[in-house]
C-alpha cells in the first residue's frame, strides 16, 4: 500500500511510501481545495512556502488544469540582506519552482529592492489586507517552525502579521 491513513481525534494524517507519492497526493488534495474555493469566490489567495520539502508537491500541482488566472500567489517568508538574484532567496525558489510556470492573476513577493525590512513588513501587511489568505501550502519544520516563525517568536496573538524575526541561528528574516 502506497498511502496509509491514521487518525487521532480530528487530525487525519496520511503517510506516503515515497516523496513522489506524497507530492502527488498533496497536489490532488490541494487542487480539490482550490476548485472548491473557486466555486465560492471569484478569486482566491494562496500563500506558498519555499523549501526543498515542497519540490514534489509544487511539480505535481502544476499538472492540474486549474484557473490559475483567478489565483493571487503570495510568498511566505524571506531572508534579509540577500541580493535580489541570490539563489538562496525564497522568492527566487518559488519563481523557479512554480510562479514562472503558471499564469497567476498576480504574484506578491516578500521583497522590495532597497527597502528597509520594516518597510517591507508594512507593505506586505497591506498586501495581506488586500489579499487575505484563503489557503496555505506549507510544511512544518523539525523544530516545529512554520516558515520563519520559530517557536520562540511564534505568538498567535501578535498584532503584527509580518515582522522581522531573529532565528535561533541568529540570521535576520522577514
Ranges and model annotations:
Residues 27-35, 58, 62, 95-99, ...:
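Generic structural signal for well-ordered alpha-helical scaffold segments
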Residues 2-10, 68-137:
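Ligand-binding beta-strand-loop-alpha-helix segment within the catalytic cores
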Residues 173:
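Conserved small/polar residues in nucleotide/adenosyl-binding loops
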Residues 143-165:
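Short, surface-exposed, charged loop/turn segments at secondary-structure junctions
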Amino acid at each position: 500500500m502506497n498511502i496509509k491513513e491514521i487518525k487521532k481525534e480530528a487530525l487525519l494524517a496520511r503517510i506516503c511510501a515515497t516523496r513522489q507519492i506524497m507530492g502527488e497526493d498533496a497536489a490532488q488534495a490541494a487542487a480539490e481545495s482550490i476548485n472548491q474555493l473557486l466555486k465560492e469566490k471569484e478569486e482566491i489567495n494562496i500563500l506558498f512556502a519555499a523549501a526543498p520539502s515542497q519540490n514534489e508537491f509544487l511539480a505535481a500541482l502544476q499538472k492540474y488544469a486549474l484557473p490559475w488566472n483567478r489565483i493571487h500567489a503570495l510568498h511566505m517568508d524571506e531572508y534579509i540582506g540577500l541580493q535580489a538574484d541570490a539563489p538562496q532567496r525564497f522568492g527566487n525558489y518559488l519563481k523557479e519552482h512554480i510562479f514562472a510556470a503558471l499564469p497567476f492573476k498576480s504574484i506578491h513577493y516578500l521583497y522590495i529592492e532597497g527597502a528597509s525590512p520594516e518597510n517591507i513588513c508594512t507593505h506586505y501587511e497591506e498586501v495581506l489586507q488586500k489579499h487575505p489568505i484563503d489557503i496555505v501550502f506549507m510544511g512544518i519544520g523539525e523544530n516545529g517552525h512554520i516558515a520563519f516563525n520559530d517557536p520562540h517568536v511564534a505568538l498567535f496573538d501578535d498584532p503584527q502579521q509580518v515582522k522581522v524575526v531573529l532565528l535561533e541561528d541568529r540570521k535576520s528574516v522577514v
